């Protein structure tokens, strides 16, 4: 299987963790905060992580089960939050404009927002530009602590699965 260099080159910290697993981990963090327990396993070959299974347990008792793979994306293009009153599903975590609520097999509601931009990074760029124009040194939307916390979670996952970024260490 041939991948883009940003994904397949260990010198660029390529692999699933920093390319796709970061999105559901960030989403779980933004919903429930920093987890009290992080458990993970992964598949590593030639210095590249091809996928991870991560379980984050939060103080409120909720658990996020995350699976991500750069080899087999079938079925992984969505994020699902399940609870006692049903489940919420959204297409890929980063640029979705639609959320589906399923109470049971008979009840389904679809909520649509404005269409995703062609490149959802434009939203992030616009937010940063606004912060700079306003003289803010930190984003209200994604404070430095949130970025640091997510990176710490990713680092814990990396260590648990035995992934090394030799060029960065």
Positions of predicted regions on the chain:
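Glycine-rich phosphate/pyrophosphate-binding beta-alpha loops
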Residues: 67-74
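A general structural signal for well-ordered alpha-helical segments in protein cores
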Residues: 24-28, 51, 96-98, 121-129, ...
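Active-site beta-strand termini and strand-to-loop segments that position acidic
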Residues: 54-61, 81-83
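Short polybasic amphipathic segments
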Residues: 79-81, 96-105
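Predominantly a Rossmann-like dinucleotide-binding segment in NAD(P)-dependent oxidoreductases
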Residues: 1-39
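Short, solvent-exposed loop/turn elements at beta->coil junctions and helix N-caps
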Residues: 40-46, 69
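C-terminal helix-rich "cap/oligomerization" subdomain common to oxidoreductases
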Residues: 59, 127-169
């Amino acid at each position: 299987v041939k991948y883009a260099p940003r994904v397949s080159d260990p010198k660029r910290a390529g692999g699933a963790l920093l390319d796709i697993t970061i999105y559901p981990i960030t989403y779980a963090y933004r919903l429930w905060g920093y987890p009290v327990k992080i458990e993970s396993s992964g598949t590593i070959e030639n210095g590249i992580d091809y996928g991870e299974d991560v379980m984050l347990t939060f103080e409120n008792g909720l658990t996020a089960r995350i699976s991500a793979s750069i080899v087999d994306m079938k079925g992984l293009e969505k994020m699902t939050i399940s609870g006692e009153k049903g489940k919420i599903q959204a297409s890929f975590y980063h640029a979705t404009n639609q959320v589906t609520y399923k109470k049971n097999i008979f009840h389904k509601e679809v909520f649509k927002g404005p269409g995703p931009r062609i490149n959802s990074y434009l939203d992030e760029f616009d937010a940063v530009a606004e912060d700079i124009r306003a003289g803010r040194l930190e984003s209200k939307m994604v404070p430095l602590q949130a970025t640091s916390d997510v990176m710490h979670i990713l680092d814990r996952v990396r260590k648990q699965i035995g992934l090394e970024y030799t060029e960065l260490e």
